[in-house]
Amino acid sequence: MNNFSYFSTIFSIALMSSNAFAGNDTLLVGFCPCIEINTLTLFLSSLYAIKPSDSCSPSYTSNLLNLFCDFVNSSTHLSISVFSSSVLSCFTSCFVIYFYPFFVFDSASYCVFNSSSREGCTSVTIGWG
């Protein structure tokens, strides 16, 4: 496990723990306790957990794209799963407020959660409804 994967896994667990301890207390008045934390979670996970099927194909010779693909491939399934679990825990506790962002994220991450249906996607096994 490289340094980034190690850090992201620990950071993900810390985010989940902070959500669990937050309970019904709000971080900002008028928001669910996990919104602010999981907004950051969504952003971070979108940087490395999503691997579009066309971006990493051999036809793309851009060094930047290749670097991005290597960056994605270096991430561990554990850290991706923990990030996803954190998002799911927020969704269940903040259904109405988090409804739209959750499904936007879910759509953008289609190949992560449904890796068997699209080529070139990161193989991740998550229990998803």
From Swiss-Prot:
Membrane-topology descriptor: Multi-pass membrane protein
Spans through the membrane: 3-23, 27-47, 85-105
Cellular localisation: Host membrane
This protein's UniProt keywords: Host membrane, Membrane, Transmembrane, Transmembrane helix
Chief localization: host cell
Gene Ontology annotations for the cellular component aspect, listed alphabetically: host cell membrane; membrane
Keyword field contains Membrane: yes
Protein's recorded name: Putative transmembrane protein 10
Source organism (scientific name): Sulfolobus islandicus filamentous virus (isolate Iceland/Hveragerdi)
Gene name in the database record: SIFV0010
